[in-house]
Amino acid sequence: MAYRKRGARREANVNNNNRMQEKDNEKQDQNNKIQLSDKVLSKKEEVITDNQEEIKIADEVKKSTKEESKQLLEVLKTKEEHQKEIQYEILQKTIPTFEPKESILKKLEDIKPEQAKKQTKLFRIFEPRQLPIYRANGEKELRNRWYWKLKKDTLPDGDYDVREYFLNLYDQVLTEMPDYLLLKDMAVENKNSRDAGKVVDSETASICDAIFQDEETEGAVRRFIAEMRQRVQADRNVVNYPSILHPIDYAFNEYFLQHQLVEPLNNDIIFNYIPERIRNDVNYILNMDRNLPSTARYIRPNLLQDRLNLHDNFESLWDTITTSNYILARSVVPDLKELVSTEAQIQKMSQDLQLEALTIQSETQFLTGINSQAANDCFKTLIAAMLSQRTMSLDFVTTNYMSLISGMWLLTVVPNDMFIRESLVACQLAIVNTIVYPAFGMQRMHYRNGDPQTPFQIAEQQTQNFQVANWLHFVNNNQFRQVVIDGVLNQVLNDNIRNGHVINQLMEALMQLSRQQFPTMPVDYKRSIQRGILLLSNRLGQLVDLTRLLAYNYETLMACITMNMQHVQTLTTEKLQLTSVTSLCMLIGNATVIPSPQTLFHYYNVNVNFHSNYNERINDAVAIITAANRLNLYQKKMKAIVEDFLKRLHIFDVARVPDDQMYRLRDRLRLLPVEVRRLDIFNLILMNMDQIERASDKIAQGVIIAYRDMQLERDEMYGYVNIARNLDGFQQINLEELMRTGDYAQITNMLLNNQPVALVGALPFITDSSVISLIAKLDATVFAQIVKLRKVDTLKPILYKINSDSNDFYLVANYDWVPTSTTKVYKQVPQQFDFRSSMHMLTSNLTFTVYSDLLAFVSADTVEPINAVAFDNMRIMNEL
């Protein structure tokens, strides 16, 4: 971890820990210019363990006299035996959804509010297209007719596939649906205008060009196009633009314009956007220097709470979210400053312990792993774990009494729920059997695995000493208080911890323990415990300050959290070495550190953006699931929808999420109501599916099968063809149902009775206008007579197939030859383009400016950290 250290002396005789610190100090200047997030995650985290002490002692062995070597080797031996003697297994489950990488912080910070892309075109499904008209004898006329056709014709065949196409179209509309529209940004010049007027977008302009140049266009329409221009109402900040749109496209764009998400922005909104506890915190000085224009707008973030309850029964997903929150929180916890010099503190501790020759085995361990990096790391871990509600596990060695005494401070200030139970029980049992029970001469506690009571709860009932029992009672009842602040569930620390008074309670208990006789233990044992307690009690003032500092930083950063802080144990844990807790207790200085305003705003913005994106993606997923059900997509893989939802949240490794959680998530999403805008858009698509199908060149809507030949009919769009334009008089059977049941008896019976039958459903419909290429592909003898007697250029062949098992049929219509067929394709007529009914006026604001980062208007500073006060209006750190 990056940290600052003053007054550190480097001795020539550097051990392994010092070398690690030197590397950090060398990198310090380089890291100063790096952003806070980069600085925190600039290198792999180092955890200080007791193994480092073994290396340290081994180094000292080489440089000491033979006599000291023997004594220190004895220490090593004893340590190893103790490590092997007590090993408590920490519950560790593998988590499949997330690998903690530094990239997760970048992913979180890259989630920005959806900037409405600068819209250059309106949303369109249709475009007008010119098609030739055929005479009664099959010849093309010189005239053309305009029809509305699909811009992007990707309609598949098969009823189910077509419904899936509409679901994908809906998904596309949801993706493209703008938060706001400014028509002025997309308007282009109308080339045919008399007075340099503008139309709404380039496609409208190109349609106007094509119609203007069409010889058959009426003069009145040309005159109208020449008059087409924008109409500005400057006093109302409104502008109207002419547009040419299919009625369905007009309905979409008009809906987008009427339901924009932008809202007026003023100073009050920005002021209220800042978390209330930051506004009211006297340590932060906030100013707004700028008056916003009347055209200022913003998009309110979507911060609905707890619609999926991922903490409830979604272990893998919850673990991923808490892990990413933990990494983010660590990046914003301030670094400790002006820690006590490690070397000076170790020397002072050695003097207090009277360890001239380091002869007492147990007390040599008191100095293990103490360094400023471990202290800083511990400070960050504790605050970040509480902010993200990550469960912690404790690593310690039972023979290191100093670690256990530091652990007593840790268990006093951090609620029990923050530790995984197995780890908590192991630590409490070690404290009880090493310190508490021996002090009173009580028998060693034999704890049964699975006991509903913790060792401290049992010890509280059995301890006669009031002060010790009182402290045990506090620890046993140290839980977060759940408080709803600004609509967000917060986990708040006990007031006695926030003001540091609980440390006096801890010290009273420790003093009582140090005064006991330890009747069943040797004198050296008693003396070791007493000296360990003395080391901690000498720093009473600093420990009170440290507790207040920890609580203040936690609560200040907690004000920037926007999602409910649900407390559920996580699958994986954050490891905490008790030696690093000792480092924190022994090295904490008197310099106050509080988060900078820029850090707070950054943390708040990242939380808001993630939360808003989370809710928007939920809305999308709920809408798609509802649409799939309404479209009767019985085979639609809901898992794919849920996977897509998780991918859009950016922090999940979706391939590793267990299937059971996917399906549980699907069930939760199904229970949620659809957001109004998304529901209205779906209803627009649902009502106009028929019109969209008609406009496709790729599919027909059915086929008529007969036992006897049916004469082909003349069609204006295709000549003489086997195309039917209505199904009047035919009995209709649904093709999808027919294929699903596989019962063709009904069709057979009808055909045998000489009754044509209409099979209704989406079928391939392909036209090919190149007759030469068609004949080249087929046996020329089929068309011999036709080619001989007629002009090839006037032929209009049509290829269609009923299903994959049937043959392809080519039918040719020309002149007076009237062929017959036993099948007809049912193809609905696309909508004709009519200029008057397609001309619409669209209205939007003439201009406005959308601001995404509201906090950019706020200039913020802090008081001098030394003067910073906590919630009780007293300085955070009083020990000067």
From Swiss-Prot:
Pfam families the record matches: Rota_VP2
Composition bias, Basic and acidic residues: 20-30
Keywords: Capsid protein, Inner capsid protein, Repeat, RNA-binding, T=2 icosahedral capsid protein, Ubl conjugation, Virion
UniProt GO cellular component terms: T=2 icosahedral viral capsid; viral inner capsid; viral nucleocapsid
Transmembrane region(s): none
Location in or out of the cell: Virion
Post-translational changes noted in the entry: Sumoylated with SUMO1 and SUMO2. Sumoylation of viral proteins seems to have a positive role on viral replication.
Gene Ontology terms for molecular function: RNA binding
Segments of this protein annotated with the region Hydrophobic: 394-414, 422-442
Domain of life: Viruses
Statement: the UniProt record of this protein carries the keyword Nucleotide-binding: no
Site residues by UniProt (Interaction with the intermediate capsid protein VP6): 220, 224, 228, 839, 841
Similarity section: Belongs to the rotavirus VP2 family.
Biological function: Inner capsid protein that self-assembles to form an icosahedral capsid with a T=2 symmetry, which consists of 120 copies of VP2, with channels at each of its five-fold vertices. This capsid constitutes the innermost concentric layer of the viral mature particle. It encapsidates the polymerase VP1, the capping enzyme VP3 and the genomic dsRNA, thereby defining the core.
Record remark: domains: The N-terminus binds RNA. It is necessary for encapsidation of VP1 and VP3. The N-termini of 10 VP2 molecules form a cylindrical hub underneath each 5-fold axis of the inner capsid.
Protein name from the UniProt record: Inner capsid protein VP2
Species this protein is from: Rotavirus A (strain RVA/Human/Indonesia/69M/1980/G8P4[10])
